[in-house]
Amino acid sequence: SPSTHIPVEFIENAPSKVIDTALTIGHEYIVMAWIEPQNRTLEKYKEYIELFNLFGDQCKKAGIKFAYHNHDFEFEMINGVRPMDLLLDTTDKDLVSFELDLYWITKGGGDPIEYIKKYPKRFPMWHIKDMANDASMTDVGEGIINFEQIFKYKDLSGLEHYFIERDDPSDSLVTAKKSFDAIIKLDI
């Protein structure tokens, strides 16, 4: 796999071990993919930004890259600040990339194309998930996310890898086949 997801505690407590393990396995990216609800404050986001820049620098020096994976909560305003914007505006673009989850950004009220335009080359990885009309997850191609339009911005995004995914499939093999077939039809 080109990337791995790790909890923030691994970065805080054993950054060198995380980097060494990822290099041994052959990952290109180490991705931090979750912030616990109690840590979703502006003060804590600012601490994470410092940590991400520091860890991103360690990764770069070791020949690997660091990225952050979004969910919907980064789009909820906190005292007039959208955490996703804070993360993108204040992390070093040469040290911190982002894995753009197209379902979660959409569910959070963000527009993937607008974010790609505003922050070019910051999203080298995408999670391809679809959203039903009721905002639940559905198989790719069966929902409301316009992947064909979004993929027109893959170069501006800096896209290197995308992952077809669904968090809650009733039959994972059926979901994988349907989603794969839907992406193939896009001829991207």
Q: Locations of the language-model features?
A:
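Active-site acidic/histidine proton-transfer and metal-coordination neighborhood
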Residues: 4-97
